[in-house]
Amino acid sequence: MSSDLPGFFEGTEMPTAGWWEALWPDPAGVLATVGVKPGMDVTDLCSGDGWFTLQIAKIARRVVAIDIDRNLLEVARHRLAESGVTNCDFVAGDAYELAKLAPRPGDFVFLANAFHGVPDRLRLAQAVRETLKPKGHFGVVNWHQRPREETSIFGEPRGPATELRLSPEETIKSIEAGGLKLTQLVEVPPYHYGVVFERSPS
């Protein structure tokens, strides 16, 4: 299981495809909401089975999908290959080592449904900053800080444990401490919010 891997972030196990795809019927819309644009060089951090990676690759110049779970990366690789997408590299590794794993500098780092499980958020934010171009962006999609019982799909509670969830304010504080500046806070219905940060030009 992914959760048994050294360095795996708590509460970020890849869910079954059925409810995950029901939760995210329009991944391209989510990406547009947080500012992923055509022609960018994008890193999909903690990419899982590639549900968002595929949509990123359809518009990006180049994508690097990074996950600690090699099995999930193979699922993602197969997903993109079936769609005829060839502009993605798949890299197994620890998210904290992002600066060593992703080509630099990049336009955008995308992280969905994983930041709540990161033990050292400052360290991760600093690693992201190192990989971005000046004025590059870091987009985080997080579960709202609501009781798990209130975030149901197909009639069952979904998502991380209630105690792991972060408010937008907590997320913003953690990432700004790593040297990135908030540029956008958006709703990502039905149960998420998105926060976007920029690396300063200097």
Feature names for model-found ranges:
Residues 4-7, 11-15, 19-20, 137-195:
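C-terminal alpha-helical "lid/dimerization" subdomain adjacent to the S-adenosyl-L-methionine
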Residues 21-40:
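Conserved alpha-helix/loop element of class I SAM-dependent methyltransferases that forms part
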Residues 43, 49-97:
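Class I SAM-dependent methyltransferase SAM/SAH-binding core
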Residues 100-108:
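A short acidic, Gly/Pro-enriched loop at the edge of an enzyme's catalytic core
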Residues 107-121:
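A short SAM/SAH-binding and catalytic strip from SAM-dependent methyltransferases
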Residues 122-137:
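A short glycine-rich, Lys/Arg-flanked "PGG" loop and its adjoining helix->strand segment in the class I
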Residues 195-202:
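C-terminal lobe and adjacent flexible extensions of AdoMet/dcAdoMet transferase-like proteins
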